């Protein structure tokens, strides 16, 4: 039996009455800075999660999932937004008054990496990458302290639903991958590097780079047989709670992925080998020195839970690495 999330379900679901109302996309500004990011309204609804025919075994059985509406980042999180979280001095430099409020200063920040975590791919407009699952959640916490808005990682179900954009085919544009280069940076066209977000066409719901460029963290623990729980059922706002450090689900494929790994149903998983070069003992909670292909995208639920529930989500103690 899969363990389900113990923190109240409001963290991952909206109140039903609100869920019936139309959501509007918006741009989130960060007070005291010139930073902002765009969030796209994703309508609630039901869909078949997984692969009906073809695909890999961990994508089966296809099962019915019902989701409340939510907002999702129009783009993958870029270094422009992520770097002020990493370094207080950089955040001060980006602030309009040269100061950082005490409550912001109190947010735990990553240890300074010993490598160039851009891997030479580029910084301005490029997706932030190689952060751990824990690091990604702490970035969401920093945004919450900065904006007062609850941002989190998407669940695996939310990610696939949003990526499909209402389509039932292998890719949101059809079952054949011949058009993939119009929408995604992947092995055939990326030249082994990330690219500035938003250069390709968006999916039907206005999400850019949902396939390729960098893989994207979801909150869920990866279990190869997790879809069996949905057989002959309708799962409502499902999530598989992480109870071990590895593996967690990564979706969307990356710049070095084959076309088949960019399908809406394709599942990826984190691996301890991503820290093989990390000289620290124990391994860093913050960085994957051998994963320049994983990044993140934000989600915001329709109705926020209480501050205490939000902090319980953010402040789960990191699981010690090997």
Task: Kindly give the residue locations of the regions a language model identified.
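Short, polar loop/linker segments at the starts of domains and inter-domain junctions
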Residues: 28, 49-67, 194-200, 262-279
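Mature N-terminal segment immediately following signal peptide/propeptide cleavage
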Residues: 33-49
């Amino acid at each position: 039996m899969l363990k389900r999330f113990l923190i109240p379900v409001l963290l991952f679901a909206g109140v039903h009455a609100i869920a019936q109302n139309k959501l509007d996309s918006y741009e989130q500004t960060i007070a005291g800075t010139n930073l902002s990011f765009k969030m796209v309204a994703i309508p609630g609804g039901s869909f078949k999660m997984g692969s009906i025919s073809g695909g890999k075994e961990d994508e089966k059985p296809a099962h019915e999932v019902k989701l409340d509406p939510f907002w999702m980042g129009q783009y993958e999180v870029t270094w422009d937004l992520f770097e002020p979280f990493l370094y207080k001095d950089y955040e001060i430099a980006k602030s309009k008054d040269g100061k950082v409020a005490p409550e912001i200063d109190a947010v735990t920040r990553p240890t300074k990496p010993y490598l160039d975590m851009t891997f030479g791919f580029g910084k301005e407009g490029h997706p932030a990458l190689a952060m751990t699952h824990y690091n990604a959640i702490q970035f969401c916490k920093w945004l919450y302290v900065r904006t007062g808005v609850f941002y989190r990682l998407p669940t695996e179900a939310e990610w696939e639903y949003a990526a499909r954009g209402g389509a039932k085919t292998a890719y949101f544009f059809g079952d054949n991958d011949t058009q993939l280069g119009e929408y995604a940076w992947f092995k055939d066209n990326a030249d082994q590097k990330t690219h500035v977000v938003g250069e390709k066409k968006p999916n039907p719901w206005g999400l850019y780079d949902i396939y390729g460029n960098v893989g994207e963290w979801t909150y869920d623990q990866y279990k190869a047989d997790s879809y069996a729980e949905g057989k002959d059922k309708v799962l409502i706002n499902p999530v598989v709670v992480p109870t071990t450090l590895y593996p967690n689900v990564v979706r969307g494929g990356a710049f070095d992925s084959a076309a088949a790994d960019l399908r809406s149903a394709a599942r990826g998983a984190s691996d301890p080998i991503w820290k093989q070069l990390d000289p620290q003992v124990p391994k860093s909670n913050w960085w994957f020195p051998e994963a320049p292909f994983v990044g993140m995208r934000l989600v915001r639920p329709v109705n926020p839970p209480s501050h205490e529930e939000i902090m319980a989500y953010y402040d789960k103690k990191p699981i010690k690495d090997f």
